[in-house]
């Protein structure tokens, strides 16, 4: 690996494009000065933003394209229109060709997933990717996957997610043996559908898993920090994510209304504002920004499309950590070490 971490950025992705991507990269660079950047997009817009960030400009290369994937494009449309020419595709292609170590985009999730699968292909034995993200809990942070990369999945898919999720938690949280749980409607072994019960059996039967399996976890256990890694298929994972985000916003609105409803409540807020500030920082979605696409033959990080520069910087940080800690190699080794088990294929005789 090069001494520098080379980061390819889709500078036209997301709701705000280069106006967020460039300052976000500049913030990340202050934390990781051994980074270099390839910025793909409208060169005039990118260079204008770079003028305010000379340190970033000095370690960046701008590659022009005026084709950007819309947040409203369907994946099939994005592939037809943006393949080979869009800022999103070119960032991914830089990873494929070895010019970058990781691609980061705040663009259309479905389009990014489709392009990543087409451009980078899947790891051997993995038939579909997953989105893994950091989830703040009362005990720290957890990794939750899949958060919507694909719908459904049999027991072998869930087992592969457990292996990849554990490798990700080991890298991000510096854990030797992370705990892993399967999201279910109850913790009892008889609960849930056939696939999830079969997945639990397959995981328990693994000879030398790189994690400690704790069984089933209910939805309220995610926020409680019941496990370092929570595994679920993409439909349930995406619903859980959106429900949690909505609940956080609802609580925030309730608190704001309560603290401004009367003179006494306003006075009380003055005494408690330090605690409320700490709570707001803990629940700040920007600090959990950066979903990792797992299962691909390359490292790809997805930022929230509507994030600000601070949030995008956290997504870049995630990509940096993935590369510096060699996540792709560790996932491959973990899948191989657990043999065809992790892929749901019978070992050779």
Swiss-Prot record:
**Cited function:** Catalyzes the reversible formation of acyl-phosphate (acyl-PO(4)) from acyl-[acyl-carrier-protein] (acyl-ACP). This enzyme utilizes acyl-ACP as fatty acyl donor, but not acyl-CoA.
Q: Which NCBIfam families match?
A: plsX
Q: In which pathway does it act?
A: Lipid metabolism; phospholipid metabolism
According to the record's subunit comment, the protein's assembly and interactions are: Homodimer. Probably interacts with PlsY.
Q: Record's Gene Ontology CC terms?
A: cytoplasm
- Swiss-Prot/TrEMBL keywords: Cytoplasm, Lipid biosynthesis, Lipid metabolism, Phospholipid biosynthesis, Phospholipid metabolism, Transferase
Keyword Nucleus tagged: no
Q: What EC designation does it have?
A: 2.3.1.274
Q: What is this protein called?
A: Phosphate acyltransferase
Q: Which domain of life is it from?
A: Bacteria
Which GO biological process categories is it annotated with? fatty acid biosynthetic process; phospholipid biosynthetic process
Under catalytic activity, the entry for this protein gives: a fatty acyl-[ACP] + phosphate = an acyl phosphate + holo-[ACP]
Look up keyword Magnesium and say if it applies.
no
Compartments reported by the entry: Cytoplasm
At the top of the EC hierarchy, this enzyme's class is transferase
What family, per the record?
Answer: Belongs to the PlsX family.
Q: Which source organism does the UniProt entry give? A: Rhodopseudomonas palustris (strain BisA53)
As one GO molecular function, the record gives: phosphate:acyl-[acyl carrier protein] acyltransferase activity
Q: Which HAMAP family match?
A: PlsX
Principal subcellular localization: cytoplasm
């Amino acid at each position: 690996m090069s001494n520098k971490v080379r980061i390819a950025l889709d500078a036209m992705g997301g709701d705000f494009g280069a106006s967020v991507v460039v300052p976000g990269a500049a913030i990340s660079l202050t934390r990781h000065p051994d980074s270099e950047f390839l910025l793909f997009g409208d060169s005039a817009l990118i260079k204008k933003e770079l003028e305010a960030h000379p340190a970033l400009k000095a370690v960046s290369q701008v590659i022009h394209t005026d084709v950007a994937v819309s947040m409203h494009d369907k994946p099939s449309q994005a592939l037809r229109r943006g393949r080979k020419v869009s800022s999103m595709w070119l960032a991914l292609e830089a990873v494929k060709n070895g010019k970058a170590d990781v691609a980061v985009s705040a663009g259309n999730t479905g389009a990014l997933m489709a392009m990543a699968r087409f451009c980078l292909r899947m790891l051997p034995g993995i038939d579909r990717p997953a989105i893994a993200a950091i989830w703040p809990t009362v005990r720290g942070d957890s990794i939750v996957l899949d958060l919507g990369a694909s719908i459904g999945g049999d027991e072998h898919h869930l087992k592969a997610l457990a292996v990849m999720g554990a490798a990700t938690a080991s890298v991000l949280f510096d854990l030797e043996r992370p705990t892993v749980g399967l999201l279910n409607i109850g913790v009892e072994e008889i609960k849930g559908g056939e696939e999830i019960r079969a997945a639990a059996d397959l995981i328990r039967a693994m000879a030398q898993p790189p994690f400690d399996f704790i069984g089933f976890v209910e939805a309220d256990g995610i926020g409680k920090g019941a496990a370092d890694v929570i595994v679920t298929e993409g439909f349930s994972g995406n619903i859980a994510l959106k429900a949690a985000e909505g609940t956080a916003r609802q609580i925030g609105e309730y608190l704001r209304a309560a603290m401004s409803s009367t003179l006494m409540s306003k006075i009380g807020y003055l005494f408690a504002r330090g605690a409320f500030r700490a709570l707001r920082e803990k629940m700040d979605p920007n600090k959990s920004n950066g979903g990792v696409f797992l299962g691909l033959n390359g490292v790809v990080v997805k930022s929230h499309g509507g994030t600000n520069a601070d949030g995008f910087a956290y997504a870049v940080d995630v990509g940096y950590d993935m590369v510096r800690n060699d996540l792709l190699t560790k996932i491959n080794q973990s899948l191989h070490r657990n043999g065809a088990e992790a892929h749901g294929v019978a070992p050779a005789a």
